[in-house]
Amino acid sequence: MSLQRLTALRALMASQPTALAAYIVPTADAHNSEYIAPVDARREWVSGFTGSAGTAVVTASQALVWTDGRYYTQFEKEADLSLWTLMKQSLPDTPNMEKWLTSNLLEGAVVGVDPHTITREEWTPLQTALLKANMQLVPVPRNLVDEARRQLGDAPPARPCNPPAPLPVHYTGMKSGQKIAMLREKMAEKKASAFIVTALDEVAYTLNLRGSDIQYNPVFFSYLIIRPTSVVLFHGTGDVENSVSEHLQKEGLVGFEAKCYDEVVPYLHSMAQELSEKGDGRHSIWLSSDASEAVHRAASGADVVKKPLSLISEVSPVALMKLIKNERELEGFRQCHIRDGVAVVRFFKWLHDQINLGATITEIQAADKLVEFRKDEADFMGPSFETIPGAGANGAIIHYSPSRGGEQTVIHKDDMFLLDSGGQYRDGTTDITRTRHMGQPTAEQRDAFTRVLKGQMMVGSALFPKGVKGNVLDSFARHSLWEVGLDYAHGTGHGVGHFLNVHEGPSGMSWRPYPDDPGLKPGQILSNEPGFYKVGDFGIRHEDLVEIIAVTKDTDHPKASGLVGDFDGRGVVGFNTLTLVPNQRKCIDVSMLTDFELCYINAYHKRVLETLGPILQQRGLLEDLHWLQQECEPIFRK
């Protein structure tokens, strides 16, 4: 199948007005979304690799995919390795795409890409590298993978266009009219005549609307253009539900217009002509640097005016606004994590009971049962991503996704079971990983489990200067693993949206800096998730969501009392852990814990029990309560 698809794509490459020596197939859609709808799953269709990150390059004789360490094992399972080459982009010896193209193509080669699927910040350095090598990067407006699909009788599915739903201010904490007013103030500071919002979660956040066009992500396909006296939404056919119009009116949004989703490029051309004809040279268009090359070109009027408008291309102010949650959003996060904790605790109690009784439970059945428990909780809207239920060796596949077709993996009593899951609630988003052994862990498993836990506790208890970049904390999580020559091939933490995308930029914790990271500040939500993966045997990951808080000597934080300064006025910040599910006591090697770590884990388990216990008691879930009490008993040294 992959050979047939590659052959069709290569034929289209050769038939272009200028034959293409290489064609690039990114993962992202026209909005640079991490998670995409089936209509945009082009890299998956041509390569067979289903991971959520990676870029394919196809030439006349080679086919390659660059992806990171989360997906090495998955790629080797899914792709036809006789046709496709894995480029391990996290490794120092792997050339990046630009280096590979300039080293392997002939001088004068033409490289093509759909300009809707590549951002300006990706396009520019690639174009520069190719030009230096006397090669050319060209936009190919009709996506060649889509064309190949049609030729093979496998046309892409229709683009989803579900009506968005209002999210009331008692969840959001700020009306959309206020958000637009703040953005217009920032536009005035930049002397921008228009601001183009291209990221789907940014449109949803700005208008306080949520959608269902991409599975697990409450967003809807749209663009938003904010001008001094108007706000234009491009969505669907341009018809907006009455409930949405009434919502926006109540939220103080004036000058609102709705247009067809496909009209955004013609509108940008028209706007560029209008502003260019004024001829005063004072008009700039502001858009995020991760907006597509196609939108950048249209916004500048590059193809329709003699002198293109200047563009302000930098991190989106909406991204920076939604990064810092307001108090209503933060309280929503705290509350939904309590309800989510109840659901996850009930699930693990059920799973252990089933395994101890000798029942046959597959990974898929476990994932489905967890959703059932979450459905019992108020304001649950669905999972926040596809559950990762890795039993045994599958736990070592970092972003494992079991197939519902064919033979199912059964969870056995001698398995280490890694469960990474999350929920979308109207008041917040959760993401939690717990690793539990279904029977008795080996000494090696206990050692790895404890080292990963020590790393998570080192991050969770850290104090650091306000505004420090997330990469500074990454080595804290790896310290105990590094001491014995172990590591993990993913970042330590990502931002999380408020009833939005479970992965949210521009901040995070990784070994390399996030390019637009404004620094860690109170009000941000991050994950704290170190891990260890022994390929072919087991995987371990501990993941909590944490809220960044300001810390003084009087703050409820385990290290607050030891403060003697505030970083010369910068301010001290730390983390408050939101996730409330115990870690498995029998997997912890107590001899490896410091006194501080032992107190920390016991205090955490005490808080879990004191928070969730009364809820289970009130609901009459006494067996679940008894299980939680056992799991949260204090840990002592022998």
Where are these regions (language model features)?
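Active-site neighborhoods and metal-handling regions in enzymes and metal-associated proteins
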Residues: 1-638
